[in-house]
Structures are given as structure tokens and as C-alpha cells.
């Protein structure tokens, strides 16, 4: 029953003495230790990230137990969440009993099964043991009398930083003091917001810049500065020396580094992300640890050596005995009458059926209830695949869960067919918009762009547009410069006060009107001319990636996307590629609402590029030769789904054929109705909307324009499943905006490559999004980002609470919570449902080790629906 660190490097030999390590050994240790944190993208390019992406070789249960032990972080839903879900009918008691029975079958014990079951049933009520019982003299005396019971295998073996074990004379924990210093230095080094006073020697790297300044830091004592005065100039040597002087043995080094990375997972995550972006900063994580451990040594050195530093903490048997008294109805008198063997058996069983195990069973029951409800919903609405109505237009939306209600209402109100596809449309591009010199990756962050696409227009039009744009940029730049300058910042309130005061009043009391006025003013001033794209391949040695596509690449990307969604025949007169974006004001998390997968890149640019490619005669001719015949009167257009207001904005409408024009007019006529229905459904889910909304679209625009609105939309909250299959599988099903939907036709995927690509790409993205929402819900203090209203945007990187907290890695409280006590997001691991024959799923699992590992270790759930409609849980 020991709980060793599951992340300790297996190849290290256990030694009790301090040793000097080779540089490559330290490098390997840092790489291995870095698995416990996830890269953290800057908030301006916010990307959903799976907090435990480096730990998937361990099971979800193992990681949950390790985090509970190492950091006291609980990643299972709390008792209040579970009770609330049960009250709302989200957990069926029968599934809990099945989970309990399965757990008992896996255990070895010698007591009567009914005794074990009775104990477990009471414990599963998730009631806390009474404090009066835990502190009772009789119980503690009993624990002392039976302390000979063998609990040697029940030990806490986590490796905590030494600073966390020490308090100074003021009662302050030294790890808190260390964190304060590290946060300060991280902010100084990582600040890319263009501050007037940059960190000196920043170009030499984090460690060297810190070393040049640390001996002048007035926040350190003279003794602490003296320790660091002649410290090594090389980060790797400094890290090795700090580990040695702290007395960390080789066998404990990785666990010790993990402990430090987990102390500030946000800042460490940002450091890790930066280290992956350029060769110049690839050693940044080593430098961070060198700074952190060097400062730890300086702070704790007066307290070294610690007495009993290596003493192992034994598990207290008091709560174990109390649990049998309270839940097992075994009195103290009965305990005294038992043999040592019987006592040991009961204690061991109570130890195994701990709080994490109980919550694990509840989570499994919650997830199984959701799977069964989804199965019943799909089964009740299944239609024959040949029962298709005639459609005048086909619209392809992002798999994003916010597309599901919009698609459902669109199909219900008109003769339309919709598809689900990853919102970058399979185009691995970096985009450069008109008037900009900077390119932005416009694809999921797990991929790298292979082509650069520039927006082009007539030279004179471009100059005129750039001049208009420069006016606005100059005003913003002047304001920012004045704000950051020591002298002009005192004058700024006098100069800008009246204007900003007027803005504050109008924005607060008439947000929709003012927001609309500002948006229209900006649109008129910055009216973008008609543009084209650099679609044709150009060899430019100054560009890291090629500009445009070759003919073969154009055909390949179009073919790949059309086959991925099964659209290779039966084209409607009008096919619309719909990217998505959001609309909010004064929102640090605006990028997260745009697209959590693509680093805040809206999908309109990609949609327009893809539609343009589909209209090229050369592409159509090549596809026709391969059997994909697009009719001459079928036109591809592009639009953008505004998720905050549920509107469709046209961004590319070429010259339409007569029949395509009719389809376009049909969409235009029905769209206001679709928006009203979709907005009503979405707004009713927000807090404080208990009555009927008279004008949903008007109310949605108010939410989007109100700069005091902390929850303009729910984002991807309540996401729970990823359904891969034909639209007929879920058509007419009200999936409540909880499902990622990706079209897939197994009959067109004989090799299984399309399914494998969906799982590797969109499937991974959906899992990351799901687990970020999960983590931000179950452990908001560690993996979330607190209350939006009290956040501080820091150094252009992310948010903090106050000015000296960790860089908060997850989603704000308002993204997952309905109220202070009620969650909105249901913390369930993603259920992937694939519509395909069983042999397709077996082949997928056999060929894709990474995905099989995720399923086996409990990071995702998997189910399938075969051609006859039979559901199977894997």
C-alpha cells in the first residue's frame, strides 16, 4: 500500500549520499520533471491546455493520488458537486452500485463481504467524520494502544521543497517568501508588454540577468546576498551546486525538482512554453530552476541542516479507526476485543477505501449516467441514412460545442444540411492580414504552420488603408507611452479625464448603443478594401515558411477536408464554410472565446481561404479526375459564426450562380429567426435569466458590449462528449451545446486513416479543452484563475490575483460556476463516440498506442455506435 512518487525517474539509482552529476544527467532530470507542468500560452493567444498532458503514461487515478499526496490538490469532484449532480438527476444510483461492486471484486480482504459493503455504502455518503469523534480522548488512547499494528507500508513519500518545511521567527513559511521573490524576477524577465524600464542584461538570459542584479536586491538580507555573491555564472552548474548544498540525494532529485515546478505551476508553465518557442531560450526552464533553487539555498541556509529532514511521515490511524466507528458501527469496545490481525485488516481496508477512491466511484457513476443518457437520446432520434430531405445549402461549422445549438436551429428552420469539421479546415497556415507585418498561426497549437498566406489588395488601396489604420495606432501608442512615462503619467489624467469619464458613463449605462456606435465608427474609418490572397506558391528566402500553395497542395488540402467530413458527392448549390469568433468588451479572456484550440485565432480567415481554393477551376478539375465532381453551379462561400450573439457574418461571397443566389437569399431570410432561437436557448442558461426574454438578440448584444459584464457567454462550459459520425446520427437531437460534432463516414474510410487523423487532431484538441474545464472546476485554487473581477493582467502574459500570485493557468470562476455554491460545468472526462463498425475501433486502438493509452489510463472515455445502431462502451 505504499505511495511512491509515480513520476520518479526509473533509471536513477537510489543513493543516500550527495553526488556530483554530469550536465546531461541534470538536463535529463529537468526534462523528466517538466512533465508535471503544462506549457502556458500568453493570454492574448490563449490556448486550452490539458494540465496533465505529460502524465498520461500513468492512470488518472494514480495522478490524482499523487497530487493529493504531493500538493494536497484534489482533482476529483467535491462532495458538494456530487450531491448537487445527484439532486439534478445527473447521477444514477445504480451505476454507483455497479462501480462499488467492481471495486470490491478487485480487492483482497478476509472480512465478510457484507461487512465491507456496509462500510463502503456509509462511506459513500461522503459525510465528514465528526471532529468531536476525531479529537475524543478515548479514540486517541485506542490509537496509541494499537500503534503496533503494521502500518509501515502506509507512508507519505512525497518530496517537498525544504523551504516548505521551515518557518521564520515571524511564523512565515519560507516557501511563501521564496515564491514572492521568484514571482518578482519572472515578471521582470518575461515582460514583453513594452515597458519603459526593461530588465538589465535581459538579452543574456534569465539566469545571467538575475545574477547581475541579485546581490543588489534590498529585499534580501545581507547574509542571503552573501551566499549568492560568488555563485556560478553557468545556470547548469548553479543548479547542480544548489542541489548538492541542499543535501538532495540523486534518487530524490527529480522529485525535488517536480516539487519546485509544482510550487508555481503557472509561472513555470509560461517558462516552459517560452523555452519551446526559440533556440535562444531553450534552456530557460533550467535557468528558472537554477534561480529558484539558488534563492532557496540562500534563504534556508541558516536553518540547515534540518533535524529529522528525512523522517518519513506515517499515515495516522486515528481517522481510519474513526471511519470504522462512524461508518462501520464498530465501537471502541469491539476494537479492543479484536486481534492484531483483525485490526490490521480493517485499517488496511479503510486506508484503501479512502476519500479519493470514494470520489472516483462517484465520478465513474456520473460519467456512466451521462453516457447512458446520451445513448438513449441518440437511439430515440436515429433516422435511416437514406431518409434525406432536399437541401439548398450546406454549411460546415467548427466542431466547437457552441456550434451545436446554432446548427440544430438552422436545420430545423430551413432546407439546410450542416457539417462539423475542425475550424481551421485542415489548412496549416500562418496568416498575415492586410496592413500588418506580423503573421499569426491560424491552426491548433498542437500543429505548426507550413504555409504563409498574405492578404493582398491594390497598392494604392493598401496605402490608404494603412494610413487610416496608423491614425488609430498612433493614438493608442501615444496614450500607452504617456501612461508608462514617469512625468507624462502625472499629466495624463488631466488630459484624458473628461473623455474617459464620458466613455465610462456611456459604456456603463447604454453599453449596446455606445458599443454599436464605436464599432460602426471603427468599421467606417477602417473600411477594408476588397482583398485577395497570396495563394500561389512563392519562393522567398526571407520567409521561414513558404508563401502560398503549389497546385498539388491546393488540391490535397481541399480533397482531405472534403473526405474528412464525407462531402464528396451530393453538393448543394451553395456550400458555406463557417469559421467562428466571439464578441466581448473589456475581457482578458477574449482569445479563449475566439478559439481555445488555435491560440485565439478566429476561423474566418481560414474559411475564406478554403472557400477560395474550392472555387478555383484548377482544383475542381483535379478533384473531378479523382471522382469528386463539384457541379459548375455550386459555389463555395465563407462566413463567420459570432458565438456571443449567434449571428452569421458573411466574409466572402463570390459571384453566385442563379441557383446559389436563391440559396443565399434563403439563408439570409431565415437567419434572424435562427439567431433569436439560438440566443434564447443560450441566454436562458446564464445566471439571473429566469423569466422569458422578449428580445434575445438585443440582450445578447448588450452582453457583448457591456464592459462590466463578467460572463458575456459560457464559452465551452459543460462540454462532455465528442461525437464522430454522420450528421444523421445526432440530427434532431438536442445535445444542449455539450457535444463536439465532427462529421465522419466510415464507408469512405476503408484504410482507417481519416479516423486516425480525426482522433490525433480534433480529438486531442477536444480532450485538452475538456480537461482544462475539468481542472478549473474541481481545483479552481490551483488550476483555475479565480474571480475575474479581482484579476490583474500582468506583463502582457496572463492574470494574477493581486500583484504577487502565481500566473493563473486556467479559466476564471465565472467560466465554470453558476454561483458561489453551484457549478455550471459538469466535470466529466471527455466521452468520444465513434460511429463505425467494431473492427474500425479495434484497428484504431491497435495502431494508435497513444490513444489506446489515454483510454486505458482513464484520460478519455470511448464508445462506439455500429452500423446497426448498437452502442458499445470500450
From Swiss-Prot:
**Principal subcellular localisation of the protein:** membrane
The residues that the entry says bind Zn(2+) are 398, 400, 580, 595
Gene Ontology terms for molecular function: zinc ion binding
Q: Per UniProt, which keywords does this protein have? A: Cell membrane, Membrane, Metal-binding, Transport, Zinc
The way this protein sits in the membrane is described as: Peripheral membrane protein
What stretches pass through the bilayer?
A: none
An example of a Gene Ontology cellular component annotation for this protein is: plasma membrane
* Annotated InterPro entries: DabA
**Names of required cofactors:** Zn(2+)
Location(s) in or outside the cell: Cell membrane
Q: Do you know which Pfam families this protein is assigned to?
A: DabA
Report the sequence similarity comment from the record: Belongs to the inorganic carbon transporter (TC 9.A.2) DabA family.
Q: How does it assemble?
A: Forms a complex with DabB.
Task of the protein: Part of an energy-coupled inorganic carbon pump.
Name it: Probable inorganic carbon transporter subunit DabA
Identify the species of origin. Answer: Bacillus cereus (strain AH820)
Its ancestry begins with: Bacteria, Bacillati, Bacillota, Bacilli, Bacillales
Tell me the gene name.
dabA
